[in-house]
């Protein structure tokens, strides 16, 4: 069974092909970073138009990479939510049209389920059950995972996602878009303990997160530094970046430890764009070593949005006979609890 996967939920156009016997046999990705850089963030209309231009050529490139033709494809998976509605519609329309033309089934895939299952693309993949930390620009969730489609969100951000807080704080520091990765690189030059940021919602019971206060704290710290120094010098920027990242990572680690204790699980999966963060990986690896458990991450190329995770997730569901109807339907907001189990 060979499944074509299409990802167009935000600012990456991803196309991949997953083979039941060989695994991932094609992976094509185009990023719109340069397109949105001048605006300091994703412009939905521009994102949609660029997906229109890039999706079909990437499908052709993926087929060529795998040395396949359209007749070799057994099904099509596409991201149907959550995400930007216009961007989602581009991928859904192309996927449904091809499925009709090629006479194969198609299925809409939940974007965050794709991220959650991305570590399964690795040879050293986690076994169920496990706790998953989904951490990206749009989501920060702790999920109890007992199988494919057997998800319970046990904690989530009540305001900003961790990735969003990274990007907004990076903007305060004058860093280029995309800011999260730039902030992490800058933090490596920072001085520990010069600034201390709070660890929000760690002093109370529960597994929910809140990162909007950290953004405000960062803004106040920047303003005070400018007042004291006359301008924001590079070392001060690095020191603020270090303190901010340390607070976010520490907060995530504290909540992960609680979630593992509550569930009794010994496996932790970290997925989503922020899972590529070096400091986060090191901290959670140390945590799981101390707890006698295991931690799993996607390969770096599968941390950000990609077609491979959509192709794989679609394969799992199509193999069980699940598929979407002919309607081109997308869900900009979509709870994982609504997904059927396999």
UniProtKB/Swiss-Prot annotation:
Keywords: Acyltransferase, Cytoplasm, Iron, Metal-binding, Transferase, tRNA processing. Its EC number is 2.3.1.234. Its cofactor is Fe(2+). Substrate binds at residues 134-138, 167, 180, 277. It is an enzyme of class 2 (transferase). GO terms for cellular component: cytoplasm. PROSITE patterns: GLYCOPROTEASE (PS01016). CDD domains: ASKHA_NBD_TsaD_bac. Pfam families: TsaD (PF00814). GO terms for biological process: tRNA threonylcarbamoyladenosine modification. Belongs to the KAE1 / TsaD family. This is tRNA N6-adenosine threonylcarbamoyltransferase. It comes from Haemophilus influenzae (strain ATCC 51907 / DSM 11121 / KW20 / Rd).
